[in-house]
Swiss-Prot record:
<protein>
    <recommendedName>
        <fullName>Protein TsgA</fullName>
    </recommendedName>
</protein>
<keyword id="KW-1003">Cell membrane</keyword>
<feature type="topological domain" description="Cytoplasmic">
    <location>
        <begin position="183"/>
        <end position="205"/>
    </location>
</feature>
<feature type="transmembrane region" description="Helical">
    <location>
        <begin position="361"/>
        <end position="381"/>
    </location>
</feature>
<feature type="topological domain" description="Cytoplasmic">
    <location>
        <begin position="1"/>
        <end position="10"/>
    </location>
</feature>
<keyword id="KW-0997">Cell inner membrane</keyword>
<feature type="topological domain" description="Cytoplasmic">
    <location>
        <begin position="122"/>
        <end position="133"/>
    </location>
</feature>
<keyword id="KW-1133">Transmembrane helix</keyword>
<dbReference type="GO" id="GO:0022857">
    <property type="term" value="F:transmembrane transporter activity"/>
</dbReference>
<feature type="topological domain" description="Cytoplasmic">
    <location>
        <begin position="382"/>
        <end position="393"/>
    </location>
</feature>
<feature type="transmembrane region" description="Helical">
    <location>
        <begin position="162"/>
        <end position="182"/>
    </location>
</feature>
<feature type="transmembrane region" description="Helical">
    <location>
        <begin position="273"/>
        <end position="293"/>
    </location>
</feature>
<feature type="topological domain" description="Periplasmic">
    <location>
        <begin position="155"/>
        <end position="161"/>
    </location>
</feature>
<feature type="transmembrane region" description="Helical">
    <location>
        <begin position="78"/>
        <end position="98"/>
    </location>
</feature>
<comment type="similarity">
    <text>Belongs to the major facilitator superfamily. TsgA family.</text>
</comment>
<dbReference type="InterPro" id="IPR020846">
    <property type="entry name" value="MFS_dom"/>
</dbReference>
<feature type="topological domain" description="Cytoplasmic">
    <location>
        <begin position="72"/>
        <end position="77"/>
    </location>
</feature>
Amino acid sequence: MTNSNRIKLTWISFLSYALTGALVIVTGMVMGNIADYFHLPVSSMSNTFTFLNAGILISIFLNAWLMEIIPLKTQLRFGFILMVLAVAGLMFGHSLALFSAAMFVLGLVSGITMSIGTFLITQLYEGRQRGSRLLFTDSFFSMAGMIFPMVAAFLLARSIEWYWVYACIGLVYLAIFILTFGCEFPALGKHAQHSQAPVVKEKWGIGVLFLAVAALCYILGQLGFISWVPEYAKGLGMSLNDAGALVSDFWMSYMFGMWAFSFILRFFDLQRILTVLAGMAAVLMYLFITGTQAHMPWFILTLGFFSSAIYTSIITLGSQQTKVASPKLVNFILTCGTIGTMLTFVVTGPIVAHSGPQAALLTANGLYAVVFVMCFALGFVSRHRQHSAPATH
């Protein structure tokens, strides 16, 4: 594989995470405007975003098989057509059913693209380089989370319709579409060259279960928290711009944290530092929820920084539970994380309707506490120390 081809594939991976991050994170910023557009209460409107998350979940789950049947390049190009149709549906359709269908299609496109992005990184890089590249790739999720809420706030403050936010997100997929030209993708399934060596199957162990629960609770907690921060902040009397700034501050700090931890993690045992980070994140989230308005920006900045490496560390630890990194194992943990994404508004919507945004934030805080417990319990059963020792690529 040529170096320019590797760079193109790596950038497709980066942008695939940016696309998913933009779609998922911008929800909290535009939810109120979309609710007004359809004359619905915000708590009811949040349920329709479950279609976006369901699309992401279904596509990540199915793409473990689809990648072996349909070439990756074909999937990405077809995804671009679906993206254009979905954004057009949001712009020109005025029914809630069409909105829900468009959100589902956006979720499908996003999930397929993200699963391809994750696969490409695990194929292109090995050993420690894989972990740091995954962390850097994941930072594009948070980079989009920093940029697109600011774009949304800018557009909405000027009374520009909410659907233009999704048109802007579509530009990310346009970049992916352009990168597919003159680019060779790894072949899979019937298109791949098969080696004669027999594949040795390994048992995953109970540590994978702990990591799967941690992944689900972490993503559900994180998105449950950040999706309702704008509504919570507005309830405290903050302006739309200030509420958007809190979300952007979180993702900016999250992004810088990922870059920092891609170096820091090399010097620590991954399970131990993951436990410390999960504990710190739970405490910082509690301080944000119970603290004064003046301290909120500082708490959300530190929360973003110290929670940034948690999810990627969970995935990396999962890949180290077997001697040979298993794509199905990594996909299983990714799927559990995506279930957390899908459940975000299923769980928090009724809580907000019944008890308000602060109750949703406290629920998210409880989920972070579960992540800490899972990471602590993992220390007694994890196989990563015996499997990661020889990996010095």
